[in-house]
């Protein structure tokens, strides 16, 4: 039906007759002529309809926004005075010789010239996606997927599919379950990742695997999460963690160069402990210059239990953030930051303004200064390298609360005070994660997943002191977002059984849930390691947006609903009966 895309017309086509298909972006009647801005996925071009072409002019006079149309015409170069530098096709226009209305459009539920609610945009997503801004994002995501496949193919990785209907395994989030009609009362689980199958592929001899695959997690949603998401899944045999990081870093480095013409440089490597100590996060945004500074040793003897209590508690932490120029913050602003850290469990936010650094103790203003002697204040000023006009903000509590609260405050201050360099790219690797973490009841859980190999210890050593063991795991972080995570996997049954035992999975349960894996580990399993990227997050960063829904064609809401199709919905009673399922609906409470 067409010979060219609208957005691809240029001066090299001058004098040629072309056929275009697309939509009316805008119509203008000017000086007896009709001007149509015609749009398709590649861009917009101006079409001129002359009244001398009576049949075409008559049809063009009926056009309204979003009519689906076909134009035939001659490409001509615009006079210099009429060149539109804001359009990629602004040097040319199409002089129409033929016009067909393929389909008319009803009045639009969205207005392209103003901001529409996200609810409306998701309900009429097929219209929202026509907007050049959205179309460009989806196209860039497609280019990213194409680049990944090409890069991995060239590096001898094999694209192998794994099952979607599989067995439920504990991977951190709730599973989406699918009832079996044949095996009544039994359920499949949709995969949270292809983790075990890709490990089995390594055992099968396919030493370099990848897959761009849909995964499913029934978890609470945030702006950068969806119940179904796309993963770039990678697994290798006979590669060390460093070698896996090398090839996947090169993938991202080359992707940024090809798609954005951005040179990322070599990624720095940071241990988990350093990331938590300096930034209060295992995914630090290095574009933000603010850091957490520990001062527990300086305040452990002060007569102020808010500080001395956590300072003398082995599970406590006292940390500060020095904010350059922050002494200008009002008391109201400081109180608002105090309320903010309260979201993360902090009981308050002590502060100290440095009005005159040269005056030392006499030059600070703080409601807690009276509890701190001159020596302590001067030591804090020295350690934080404070200067006149700065403010020092204090966090004191359990280490986990301080790290999370002050880490979040660091990010908020970076945004509010425009300290974060939003024009920069700051990738890094975070490594040497703890193997396990404690829940509130003293039980151990795998920090990544239970198939991650410990770093440099035997099964016996791990069992003797699991709480201090590190894992051979690594996360790739870009601008404060974890875009990929991976690890070396356990490749012998003894170690895997030991890890299951530490996690409280008894022998019987191990066989029920993971018997196939433990059996497979007996037959010459190679050492293997891998990584999975979140394609949605990578695309989000590439497109310069902060909402993952902006780079997914048909996303769900934060309530895991599809406003376009009204999913999820009630099932047909006959289908439920065939599956031997009875649904118990929550009773509605009287108002």
UniProtKB/Swiss-Prot annotation:
Positions of the UniProt region annotated as Aspartate: 195-198
Chain coiled-coil ranges: none
Q: Which catalytic reaction applies to this protein?
A: tRNA(Asp) + L-aspartate + ATP = L-aspartyl-tRNA(Asp) + AMP + diphosphate
Tell me the residue numbers annotated for binding ATP: 217-219, 226, 482, 534-537
* Enzyme nomenclature, EC number: 6.1.1.12
Principal location listed in the UniProt entry:
cytoplasm
Its EC top class is ligase
Protein's UniProt keywords contain Aminoacyl-tRNA synthetase? yes
The record, for InterPro entries, names: Aa-tRNA-synt_II, aa-tRNA-synth_II, aa-tRNA-synth_II/BPL/LPL, Asp-tRNA-ligase_1, Asp-tRNA-ligase_1_N, Asp/Asn-tRNA-synth_IIb, AspRS_core, GAD-like_sf
Subcellular compartments: Cytoplasm
Q: Which family does it belong to?
A: Belongs to the class-II aminoacyl-tRNA synthetase family. Type 1 subfamily.
Q: How does it assemble?
A: Homodimer.
Q: What is this protein called?
A: Aspartate--tRNA ligase
What species does this protein belong to? Aliivibrio fischeri (strain ATCC 700601 / ES114)
Name the gene behind this protein: aspS
């Amino acid at each position: 039906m067409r010979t060219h895309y609208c957005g691809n017309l240029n001066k090299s086509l001058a004098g040629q007759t072309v056929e275009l298909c697309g939509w009316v972006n805008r119509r203008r009647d000017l000086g007896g002529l009709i001007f149509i801005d015609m749009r398709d996925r590649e861009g917009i071009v101006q079409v001129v309809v002359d009244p001398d072409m009576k049949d075409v002019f008559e049809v063009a006079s009926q056009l309204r926004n979003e009519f689906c149309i076909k134009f035939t015409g001659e490409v001509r170069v615009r006079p210099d005075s009429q060149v539109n530098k804001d359009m990629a096709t602004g040097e040319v226009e199409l002089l129409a010789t033929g016009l067909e209305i393929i389909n008319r459009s009803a009045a639009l539920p969205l207005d392209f010239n103003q901001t529409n609610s996200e609810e409306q945009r998701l309900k009429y997503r097929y219209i929202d996606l026509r907007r050049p801004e959205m179309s460009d994002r989806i196209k860039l995501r497609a280019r990213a997927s194409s680049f990944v496949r090409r890069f991995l193919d060239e590096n001898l990785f094999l694209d192998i599919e794994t099952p979607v209907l599989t067995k439920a395994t504990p991977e951190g989030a709730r599973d989406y379950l699918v009832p079996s009609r044949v095996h009544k009362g039994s359920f499949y689980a949709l995969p949270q990742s292809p983790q075990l199958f890709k490990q089995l592929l390594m055992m099968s001899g396919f030493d370099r695997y990848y897959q761009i695959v849909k995964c499913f997690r029934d978890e609470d949603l945030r702006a950068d999460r969806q119940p179904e998401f796309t993963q770039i899944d990678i697994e290798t045999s006979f590669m060390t963690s460093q070698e896996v990081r090398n090839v996947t870093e090169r993938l991202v480095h080359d992707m940024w160069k090809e798609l954005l013409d951005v040179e990322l440089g070599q990624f720095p490597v940071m241990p988990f402990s350093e990331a938590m100590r300096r930034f209060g996060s295992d995914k630090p945004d290095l574009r933000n210059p603010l850091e957490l500074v520990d001062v527990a040793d300086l305040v452990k003897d002060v007569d102020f239990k808010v500080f001395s209590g956590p300072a003398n508690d082995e599970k406590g932490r006292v940390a500060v953030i020095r904010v350059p120029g922050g002494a200008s913050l009002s008391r109201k602003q400081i109180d608002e930051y105090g309320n903010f850290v309260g979201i993360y469990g902090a009981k308050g936010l002590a502060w100290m303004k440095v009005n005159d650094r040269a005056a030392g103790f006499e030059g600070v203003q703080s409601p807690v200064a009276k509890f701190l002697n001159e020596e302590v204040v001067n030591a804090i000023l020295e350690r934080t390298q404070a200067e006149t006009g700065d403010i020092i903000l204090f966090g004191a509590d359990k280490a986990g609360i301080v790290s999370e609260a002050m880490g979040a405050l660091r990010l908020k201050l970076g945004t509010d005070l425009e300290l974060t360099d939003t024009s920069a790219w700051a990738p890094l690797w975070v490594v040497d994660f703890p193997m396990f973490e404690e829940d509130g009841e003293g039980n151990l859980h795998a920090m990544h997943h239970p198939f991650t190999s410990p770093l440099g210890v035997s099964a016996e050593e791990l069992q003797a002191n699991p709480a201090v063991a590190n894992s051979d795991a690594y996360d790739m972080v870009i601008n404060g977002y974890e875009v990929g995570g991976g690890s070396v996997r356990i490749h012998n049954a003894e170690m895997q059984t030991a890890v299951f035992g530490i996690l409280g999975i008894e022998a019987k349960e191990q066989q029920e849930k993971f018997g196939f894996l433990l059996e497979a580990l007996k037959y010459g399993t190679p050492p293997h390691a891998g990584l999975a990227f979140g394609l949605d997050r990578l695309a989000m960063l590439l497109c310069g947006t902060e909402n993952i829904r902006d780079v997914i064609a048909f996303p769900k809401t934060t309530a895991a609903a599809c406003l376009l199709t009204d999913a999820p919905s009630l099932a047909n009673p006959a289908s439920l009966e065939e599956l031997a399922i009875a649904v118990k609906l929550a009773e509605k409470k009287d108002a």
